[in-house]
């Protein structure tokens, strides 16, 4: 696996490499990330990963400096997964001057996760566009676990006419249904036992809608009540349209149920397509 930090070296390394599939990460990799690398192989000739902890997407109450940096272990995992090229820029490489030009997503950045993490999706969209310009891939993989992020990137790519196919990678789960996340490591043993409740409740919402329930607000409120009774502190449980995460206009269009809630001090997110 080649490792490059400079944009010029990266572009030189990617000449004549066929169809390039790009998987951006912030490092601290787990099996969910590695699954994206494996899925990417089926969509192109060359798989490029990136590791960059992006300061722009951290909010005022989110500690950029405490984000785990596990670079050597990440490199070993990526090489074992068959990644061809790793782009690992420093802040000076990617932001050689203050980033005064940014990507401002529309209203989607202010709902759901965006309501609780103001400015987050502006930072995500800006760094992803910049990484796209560095790598110049033909396709890019983003996990469906971060569903709102996937929609922001997919819609940005379409509206800015970027020649990149955005592919949603399926969420990898533990045997009990908990979505794999670096945050799971912060759960106590008791919290880890409780954590799959979030996915079970999303499954119950999907089952109810498929069985004919049309009152999505009632389903949301029932799930919130169940989480609260079990000691969770909820940000949201929401049923939305898949395409743009707007409020559902009936239950016949493709929908997604999404949730974000805190178990102890750990904020967990999950979703399920309906």
From Swiss-Prot:
Keywords: ATP-binding, Cytoplasm, Ligase, Nucleotide-binding, Pantothenate biosynthesis. ATP binds at residues 26-33, 143-146, 172, 180-183. Its EC number is 6.3.2.1. It catalyses: (R)-pantoate + beta-alanine + ATP = (R)-pantothenate + AMP + diphosphate + H(+). The active site is at 33 (proton donor). CDD domains: PanC. Homodimer. Belongs to the pantothenate synthetase family. HAMAP family: PanC. NCBIfam families: cyt_tran_rel (TIGR00125), panC (TIGR00018). This is Pantothenate synthetase. It comes from Dechloromonas aromatica (strain RCB).
């Amino acid at each position: 696996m080649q490792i490059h930090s400079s944009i010029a070296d990266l572009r030189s390394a990617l000449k004549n490499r066929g169809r390039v599939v790009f998987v951006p990460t912030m490092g601290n990799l787990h099996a969910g990330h590695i699954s994206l690398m494996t899925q990417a192989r089926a969509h192109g000739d060359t798989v490029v990963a990136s590791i960059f902890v992006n300061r722009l997407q951290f909010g005022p109450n989110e500690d950029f400096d405490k984000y785990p940096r596990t670079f050597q272990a990440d490199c070993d995992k990526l090489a074992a997964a068959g990644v061809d090229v790793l782009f690992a820029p420093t802040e000076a490489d990617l932001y050689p001057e203050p980033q005064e030009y940014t990507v401002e997503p529309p209203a989607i950045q202010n709902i759901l996760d965006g309501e609780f993490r103001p400015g987050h999706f502006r930072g995500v969209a800006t760094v992803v566009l910049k990484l796209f310009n560095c790598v110049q891939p033909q396709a890019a993989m983003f996990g469906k676990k971060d569903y709102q992020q996937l929609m922001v990137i997919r819609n940005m790519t379409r509206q800015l006419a970027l020649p990149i196919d955005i592919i949603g990678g399926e969420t990898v789960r533990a045997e009990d249904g908990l979505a794999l996340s670096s945050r799971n490591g912060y759960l106590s043993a008791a919290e880890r036992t409780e954590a799959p409740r979030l996915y079970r409740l999303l499954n119950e919402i999907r089952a109810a809608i498929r069985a004919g329930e049309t009152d999505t607000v009632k389903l949301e409120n029932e799930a919130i009540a169940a989480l609260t009774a079990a000691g969770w502190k909820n940000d949201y449980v929401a049923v939305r349209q898949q395409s743009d995460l707007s409020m559902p206009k009936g239950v016949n269009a493709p929908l997604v149920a999404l949730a974000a809630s805190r178990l102890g001090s750990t904020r967990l997110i999950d979703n399920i397509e309906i």
